[in-house]
């Protein structure tokens, strides 16, 4: 944040027991612009100073050097700073204009690696809306991670192993056909999977058949392995089409199968440390002494087959050895919370202090008309279908608003896909939310297209002028610009908070706030009037576009030049 150094130093002159860094981290934006431009809360000082926060705030204001600020006031437990508007406008606009997309970058991460386990669809099943959250939250966090100076490693831990493949192989051999699969691979494989579960309700022995085929696959049976490879290859083709549409790439596609030859090492280490206990023929790690409410971690079943826990432990060890991560994030639904608590507990018992660097980035559910989706029942909402429908809705609105726009199809794809991504990310990560596509793709309201349209509007203004913009004399005196200036000023702090809280919605909500501030200004101002402040106003418009474009990029959303 521009001018924060002055605020931090002024506070530090009074609060000598706090470091500059500690003060800087406490600064925040007031709830309303009427309260000031930057706020310093005093709650955490009450304990050490043995005073009520309101009194502490009043004491700070009485002692602080107010030179360089419009005013500094105490409002309850907050010290609120009102910045010098002309000087701050000049500083903020010059900084954004000069740095462009690098505005908001910081070097906190110092290049340290952060692995991000994300997306992870299951082979032989289509990508559904159920995969959207892990995919887009993971991608946005990777972008935010990089913006904060870290080196993200995006890992698509494919669900390409497990008892479900035994079930699928059995179903294919029992009532499937090669010709049917080749004609429509994923849809046919999904149909077999659903049919298997329907038949297994009437005949439980089918589950034994499925387990037996999976055991064959684990033991290297040639036919089982050939069918598994075929199912995997067909699935990856379809996944790649979806990822291309979302403009998402990965650094690794190492899925569950990759760790088949790495699990014995985990079992050996557990045995060496006397952590394995036999329970009803299975091998477990007892965690009750760590937390009495924690169920045992299952390592091997009674038939010798390995379990997800064994594989995830092997993956954690491999990732630490390969990437030496500073943090390892797992973007997985909130219902898996206990699994990650168990995994970290087992790694800790094994003596790996870096288990504390593993974080479960939990998220809530997407529902459609209040209903959760289930692949087993077959009532699944396909991500491809949603992206197709979003494209059509976006195209319809573009044709109405701008019939002469060139390459409408490309723009409609960027707007439609962007709308779906933005809507997911503007919701707090851990919240559940209901999905209504028509609301999501609207060009007004709290939507991705609204932010994209605002950015395109700013770019359109800049195309209408031949003025060569400079960063000289950016002293805007129009009070109508102040909301935009303070919002632009908050962007670097917003980027930091999004990383610290692992919360992409902070960026999405910021982009909406900046869009609203700009559109209010646009509706009430003559931006292109030829006067001495024309350059400053145009630099303001360009700065808005720079920061909106960067905000959208961090979220994984395109920023069309025109809409």
UniProtKB/Swiss-Prot annotation:
The record's section on Pfam families has: Arg_tRNA_synt_N, DALR_1, tRNA-synt_1d
Q: What is its main location?
A: cytoplasm
Q: Where in the cell is it found?
A: Cytoplasm
Identify the residue span(s) of motif 'HIGH' region.
Answer: 121-131
Query: Which controlled-vocabulary keywords does the entry list?
Result: Aminoacyl-tRNA synthetase, ATP-binding, Cytoplasm, Ligase, Nucleotide-binding, Protein biosynthesis
Q: Does the keyword Protein biosynthesis apply?
A: yes
| A GO term for molecular function | ATP binding
Record GO biological process: arginyl-tRNA aminoacylation
Q: Matching InterPro entries, A to Z?
A: Arg-tRNA-ligase (IPR001278), Arg-tRNA-synth_N (IPR005148), Arg-tRNA-synth_N_sf (IPR036695), ArgRS_core (IPR035684), DALR_anticod-bd (IPR008909), Rossmann-like_a/b/a_fold (IPR014729), tRNAsynth_Ia_anticodon-bd (IPR009080)
Reactions catalysed, semicolon-separated, are:
tRNA(Arg) + L-arginine + ATP = L-arginyl-tRNA(Arg) + AMP + diphosphate
**Enzyme class, spelled out:** ligase
Q: List the disulfide bonds.
A: none
Protein EC = 6.1.1.19
Q: Does the keyword Ligase apply?
A: yes
Q: Which GO terms describe its cellular component?
A: cytoplasm
Q: Which Gene3D superfamilies match?
A: Arginyl tRNA synthetase N-terminal domain, HUPs, Isoleucyl-tRNA Synthetase, Domain 1
Q: Which family does it belong to?
A: Belongs to the class-I aminoacyl-tRNA synthetase family.
Quaternary structure (record): Monomer.
What NCBIfam families does the entry give?
A: argS
Entry protein name: Arginine--tRNA ligase
Q: Which organism is it from?
A: Leuconostoc mesenteroides subsp. mesenteroides (strain ATCC 8293 / DSM 20343 / BCRC 11652 / CCM 1803 / JCM 6124 / NCDO 523 / NBRC 100496 / NCIMB 8023 / NCTC 12954 / NRRL B-1118 / 37Y)
Q: Which gene encodes it?
A: argS
């Amino acid at each position: 944040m521009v001018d924060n150094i002055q605020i931090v130093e002024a506070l530090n002159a009074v609060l000598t027991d706090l470091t500059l860094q500690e003060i800087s981290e406490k600064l925040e934006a007031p709830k309303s612009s009427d309260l000031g431009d930057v706020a310093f809360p005093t709650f955490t000082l009450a304990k050490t100073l043995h005073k009520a926060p309101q009194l502490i705030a009043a004491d700070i204001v009485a002692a602080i050097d107010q030179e360089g600020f419009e005013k500094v006031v105490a409002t309850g437990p907050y010290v609120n700073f009102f910045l010098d508007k002309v000087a701050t406008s000049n500083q903020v606009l010059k900084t954004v204009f000069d740095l462009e997309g690098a505005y908001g970058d910081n070097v906190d991460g110092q290049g340290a690696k952060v692995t991000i386990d994300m997306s992870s669809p299951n082979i032989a099943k289509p990508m559904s809306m159920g995969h959207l959250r892990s995919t887009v939250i993971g991608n946005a966090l990777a972008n935010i991670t990089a913006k904060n100076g870290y080196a993200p490693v995006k890992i698509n831990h494919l669900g390409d192993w497990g008892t479900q493949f035994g079930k699928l192989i059995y179903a294919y051999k029992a009532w499937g056909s090669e010709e049917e699969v080749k004609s429509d691979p994923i849809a046919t494989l999904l149909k077999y999977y659903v049919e298997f579960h329907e038949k297994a309700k009437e005949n439980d022995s089918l589950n034994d058949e499925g387990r037996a085929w999976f055991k064959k696959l684990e033991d290297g049976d040639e036919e089982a392995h050939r069918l598994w490879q075929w199912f995997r290859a067909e699935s990856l083709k379809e996944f790649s089409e979806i990822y291309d549409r979302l403009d998402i790439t990965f650094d690794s596609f190492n899925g569950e199968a990759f760790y088949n030859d790495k699990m014995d090492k985990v079992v050996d280490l557990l045995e060496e440390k006397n952590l394995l206990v036999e329970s009803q023929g299975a091998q477990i790690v007892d965690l009750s002494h760590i937390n009495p409410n924690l169920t045992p971690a299952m390592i091997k079943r009674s038939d010798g087959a390995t379990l997800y826990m064994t594989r995830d432990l092997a993956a954690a060890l491999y990732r630490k050895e390969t990437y030496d991560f500073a943090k390892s994030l797992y973007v997985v639904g909130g219902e898996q919370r206990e699994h990650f608590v168990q995994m970290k507990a087992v790694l800790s018992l094994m003596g790996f202090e870096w288990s504390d660097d593993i974080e479960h980035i939990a998220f809530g559910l997407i529902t459609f008309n209040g209903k959760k989706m289930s692949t087993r029942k077959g009532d699944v909402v396909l991500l491809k279908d949603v992206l197709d429908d979003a494209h059509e809705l976006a195209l319809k609105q573009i044709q109405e608003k701008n019939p002469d726009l060139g390459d409408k199809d490309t723009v409609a794809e960027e707007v439609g896909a962007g709308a779906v991504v933005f809507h997911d990310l503007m919701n707090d990560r851990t919240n559940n939310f209901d999905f209504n596509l028509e609301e999501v793709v609207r060009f007004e309201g709290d939507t991705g297209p609204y932010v994209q349209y605002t950015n395109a509007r700013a770019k359109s203004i800049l195309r209408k002028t031949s003025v060569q913009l400079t960063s000289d004399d950016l002293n805007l005196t129009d009070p109508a610009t102040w909301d935009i200036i303070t919002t632009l000023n908050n962007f670097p702090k917003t980027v930091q908070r999004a990383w610290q809280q692992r919360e992409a919605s902070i960026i999405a909500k910021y982009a909406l706030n900046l869009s609203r501030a700009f559109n209010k200004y646009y509706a009430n101002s003559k931006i292109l009037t030829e006067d001495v402040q024309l350059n400053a106003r145009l630099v303001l418009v360009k700065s808005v576009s720079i920061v909106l474009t960067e905000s959208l990029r961090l979220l994984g959303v395109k920023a069309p030049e025109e809409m």
